[in-house]
């Protein structure tokens, strides 16, 4: 009989946020798979729990994924945790969940802290519709392409960012979204020095030109303004090929340009791809 994989959310700063169910899962586990075993060991030691640990992260997920699946198939119950917060959100836990599903292994979640959601509800920005965008690329071109893809989205956007990248990211957001977009910069969530800075992108750039970013950030960015229904569709007067070529000229890859043009026209990507390459 197969074991079960438990996705356990762990505190994002305050150890008092650990749930009774999380501790129960730790105590009942045959093995705990952790993104950083040293960090998880500190958590276990705090609660006087002694369990075997194995690492599972972006750089070993393929071999460790197969290893964990083999243990689950032999009836072992395994807990998966990330460094902090909920696993499988913008981390390699997503791949392990897929492997379990492919192998008919039960997966369950033990809910708890999620930095993005906590930052969102503190931001003061609309929460009815939002999109989690995760970490932006360290590559400037890829980062700008990502921002271009979402600049016209009307829902609130959630990003994770490291302190050493924050200034470059804000600069790219200013160029792509405009400096008057509202943003909330949330750091040190649930900790003593928790901070929420609510301002515009321009104001954030001015602030961090004089203050060094510290700690991991969640950036909550206001969505684009709704387009008036009476406004003429700017894409009606150009062909799909011209539409895609426009985005390519702005620096997008052909794949991303086709995806963006399809979204603009509310068409399937495959239809836009076929039309763009027709006659080649």
Map each language-model feature to its residues.
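Conserved helicase motor
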Residues: 54-62, 136-139
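Short active-site oxyanion
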Residues: 26-32, 104-108, 156-157
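Class I SAM-dependent methyltransferase SAM-binding "motif I" and its flanking Rossmann-like core
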Residues: 95-153
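A contiguous loop/helix-start segment that scaffolds small-molecule binding in enzyme catalytic cores
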Residues: 2, 156, 163-280
């Amino acid at each position: 009989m197969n074991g079960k994989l438990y996705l356990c959310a762990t505190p994002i700063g305050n150890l008092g946020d650990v749930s009774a169910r999380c501790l129960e899962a730790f105590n009942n586990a045959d093995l705990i798979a952790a993104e950083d075993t040293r960090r998880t060991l500190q958590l276990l030691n705090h609660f006087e729990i002694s369990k075997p640990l194995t690492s599972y992260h972006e750089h070993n997920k393929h071999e460790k994924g197969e290893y964990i699946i083999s243990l689950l198939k032999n009836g072992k119950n395994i807990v998966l945790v990330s460094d902090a917060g909920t696993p499988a959100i913008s981390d390699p836990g997503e791949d392990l969940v897929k492997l379990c599903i492919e192998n008919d292994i039960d997966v369950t979640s033990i809910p708890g802290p999620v930095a993005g959601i906590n930052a969102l509800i503190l931001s003061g920005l609309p929460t009815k519709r939002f999109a989690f965008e995760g970490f932006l690329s360290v590559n400037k071109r890829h980062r700008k392409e990502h921002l271009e893809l979402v600049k016209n989205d009307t829902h609130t956007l959630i990003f994770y960012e490291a302190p050493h990248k924050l200034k470059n990211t804000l600069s790219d957001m200013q160029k792509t979204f405009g400096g008057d977009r509202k943003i909330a910069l949330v750091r040190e969530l649930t900790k003593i020095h928790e901070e929420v800075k609510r301002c515009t992108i321009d104001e954030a750039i001015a602030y961090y030109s004089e203050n060094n970013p510290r700690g991991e950030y969640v950036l909550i960015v206001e969505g684009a303004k709704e387009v008036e229904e009476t406004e003429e569709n700017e894409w009606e007067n150009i062909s799909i090929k011209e539409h895609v070529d426009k985005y390519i000229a702005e620096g997008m890859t052909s794949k991303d340009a086709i995806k963006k043009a399809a979204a603009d026209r509310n068409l399937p990507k495959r239809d836009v791809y076929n039309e763009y390459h027709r006659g080649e």
